[in-house]
Amino acid sequence: KKYYQANKEKLAEYQRERRKTDSLFKMKRYLSNRTSMAFKKKGYKKNSKTEKMLGISYEKVKKHIGRQFQNGMTWSNYGEWHIDHIIPLSSAKTEAELLKLCHYRNLQPLWAADNMSKGAKIPQVQIQIKL
């Protein structure tokens, strides 16, 4: 923690540069940050690693997302599209629900404009998430 405090700007720059060239790293950081924010907003403590909550390795999550790409989506243009939680994390009513919504089967790639217009709406067709 002391090292982080003393080198905050240097570490932030390193992460910024790495996210530009390493799509797996960018995806990991996004999912970890998004999950942490969701738990904080709901007043819960995140007790597990994000990868454990996803239910599979980050590498497999990346493949899962890639298999759902729409025409024109690539890992090179990640940013023009987002990783979307099909059922928004904000819709969770309990900590157990929030944990289930973190599962990889609740993730899909969505064009940025479509994701922004979707917002926190729950789609008509819901998915079953098995843990």
Q: Where on the chain are the PLM-derived regions?
A:
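Histidine-centered catalytic micro-motifs used for acid/base chemistry in nuclease
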Residues: 63-95, 106-113
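Charge-enriched, short contiguous segments at helix-coil
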Residues: 95-101
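Contiguous alpha-helical segments
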Residues: 1-82, 128-131
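Intrinsic disorder/low-complexity detector
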Residues: 5-9, 24, 87, 108, ...
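Short Cys/His-centered divalent metal-binding micro-motifs
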Residues: 103-130
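Short, solvent-exposed loop/helix junctions and linker helices
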Residues: 55, 101-104
